[in-house]
Amino acid sequence: MAHLFIFGLGYSAKRIKRALENAGWTVEGSGSDGDLAFGDDEAIRAALGRASHVLSSVPPDGDADPVLDRYGDALRHEWLGYLSSSGVYGDTGGAWVDESAPAGGGRRTARALCDAAWLARSARVFRLPGIYGPGRSAFERIAEGKARRIDLPDQVFSRVHVEDLARGVLAGLDAPPGAYNLADDLPASQNAVIEEACRLLGMVPPPLQSLEEAGLSSQARGFYAENRRVANGKARRVLGWEPRFPDYRAGLRDILRRSSP
């Protein structure tokens, strides 16, 4: 019977779990919303013994991968998956980037090391851009007064709706090992996303600010230090994946529709 174990049942992995359970899979997992504690070696190893597939969404700890460090010897499964980041490509100056590009040149060197370690184990590595969806979108930032429009002309980012992410991982269950970018079709500036969300809400967008005026944290400033467009052609060709939400406009409309009484 198809049985998946997920390390790290967070926002994205919970959607994957739900989609697989709806398809008849048995899914176990660790994490704050999982059945098992990551440090419970005996229970985790028993669960890994029951699983036919293993997926990790656990981020690096320093330069190390916590899952591989602690349970790598138990990962002899034919199907391994890892949720990585398109940040491994670094800054491309707004140019398109696909899976043939070198990884490790950006600020996320630890993620690139973990990405490579999972690829070395013949895993399916899903490189993800900014993830958004219900409960985690521009609407929440606007409601919390945290939405910012930063004056950085020509800067763009890629993103993916969490439901399309889950569908991409499901499509990857029958795919050969390798890296797969799961991004929608329309890279766009963060400003464009905020402006569209405000338009849908009938609100005036926040004022345009410089990075200095916005008072962003160092982590947030790092987000704006990179500029790239993530290509999804390989996922379309090899996985047969097609995003249900091909751009942020479609995704935001659906989120708002679902949240309306």
Task: Pin down the residues of each PLM region.
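Mid/C-terminal beta-alpha module of Rossmann-like enzyme folds, strongest
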Residues: A166-A220
